[in-house]
């Protein structure tokens, strides 16, 4: 897929990132992954992110990622697949090239590992990754990888395949400056944990879409919320927030890492044998699994 086509696709609807199932031996469970991705692709997602943050990119060995991308492409039909990418520059370039070879339609460049970097370093890192591939690139503005508007503008001037900006910083003043500065040069994606909680504020800042984690196990509800948001049906959004998203947030906030583990729990409760999360994350307790089951039952009725 050409980068500009991917840019158009990204802005066309809701996005999500499937969990990565692990089998009894701890390895990638391709059969379950294909089944789950095929199910998700039957709903209205504009694109799916393979080996993204909720797909436990941080715990995957780089050589596991191409197989995950190939499996997603095989199962998703016409739904574009974007691969997670990250770590230091050399590793990120290697992952990006392998993902492109595996058939990814684009990459999401997640924050580099641990250490802070100046704007000049972030510029060089992102430019080198963009220059290494021909497919579209989205940058994820979060944690130790916060781009300022002038840095992003310089990147847009020299990287034609940089087509998306995803924000998980919550710094609305900065992201509004970025969307005002870059205009339609980029597609803007909300990327806060449980993005629906922040979707209205991000929409006002020019972010027309976001990646929904709960789409993994309640896709119909996730699509309903997105459509209500885009149609300006605030009362419907408020009802869904109160009935589902705030109770889910309460479960998610019970432990660090549950932004991923709670999603994987929901997928297991939906009937897909997604297996455990990889360390250093931990799975929900039996009590918390019961809480998730009750919440899902309340919205399934």
Curated annotation (Swiss-Prot):
Q: TM spans, by residue?
A: none
InterPro entries the UniProt entry points to? Aldolase_TIM, DapA-like, Dehydro-deoxyglucarate_dehyd
Decide whether keyword Lyase is in the record.
yes
Q: Which reaction does it catalyse?
A: 5-dehydro-4-deoxy-D-glucarate + H(+) = 2,5-dioxopentanoate + CO2 + H2O
> Which SMART domains does the entry mention?
DHDPS
Which CDD domains would you find in this protein's record?
Answer: KDGDH (cd00951)
* Alphabetical list of SUPFAM superfamilies matching this protein: Aldolase (SSF51569)
EC nos? 4.2.1.41
* Sorted UniProt keywords: Lyase
Gene Ontology MF, one: 5-dehydro-4-deoxyglucarate dehydratase activity
Q: Please give a single GO biological process term from the UniProt record.
A: D-glucarate catabolic process
Tell me the route in metabolism or biology where this protein functions: Carbohydrate acid metabolism; D-glucarate degradation; 2,5-dioxopentanoate from D-glucarate: step 2/2
Classify the source by domain of life: Bacteria
* Family, per entry: Belongs to the DapA family.
Q: What is this protein called?
A: Probable 5-dehydro-4-deoxyglucarate dehydratase
Q: Which organism is it from?
A: Chelativorans sp. (strain BNC1)
């Amino acid at each position: 897929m050409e980068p500009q086509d991917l840019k158009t696709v990204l802005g066309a609807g809701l996005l999500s990132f499937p969990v990565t199932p692990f089998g009894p031996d701890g390895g990638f469970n391709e059969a379950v992954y294909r089944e789950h991705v095929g199910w998700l692709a039957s709903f209205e997602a504009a694109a799916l992110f393979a080996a993204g943050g909720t797909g436990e990119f941080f715990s995957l060995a780089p050589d596991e990622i191409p197989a995950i991308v190939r499996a997603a492409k095989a199962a998703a039909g016409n739904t574009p697949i974007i691969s997670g990418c990250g770590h230091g520059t050399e590793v990120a370039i290697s992952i990006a090239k392998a993902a492109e070879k595996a058939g990814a339609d684009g990459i999401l460049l997640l924050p580099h590992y641990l250490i802070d970097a100046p704007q000049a370093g972030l510029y060089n890192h992102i430019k080198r990754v963009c220059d290494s591939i021909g497919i579209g690139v989205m940058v994820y503005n979060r944690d130790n990888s916060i781009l300022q508007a002038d840095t992003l503008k310089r990147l847009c001037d020299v990287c034609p395949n940089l087509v998306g900006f995803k924000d998980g910083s919550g710094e609305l003043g900065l992201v509004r400056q970025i969307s005002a500065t870059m205009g339609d040069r980029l597609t803007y994606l909300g990327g806060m944990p449980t993005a629906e909680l922040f979707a209205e504020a991000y929409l006002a800042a020019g972010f027309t879409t976001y990646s929904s984690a709960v789409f993994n196990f309640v896709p119909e509800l996730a699509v309903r919320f997105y459509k209500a948001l885009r149609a300006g049906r605030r009362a419907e959004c408020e009802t869904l927030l109160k009935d589902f998203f705030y109770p889910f947030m309460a479960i998610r906030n019970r432990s660090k890492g549950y932004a991923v583990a709670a999603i994987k729990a929901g997928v297991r409760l939906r009937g897909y044998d997604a297996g455990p999360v990889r360390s250093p994350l931990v799975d929900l307790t039996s009590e918390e699994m019961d809480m998730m089951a009750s919440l899902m039952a309340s919205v399934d009725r």
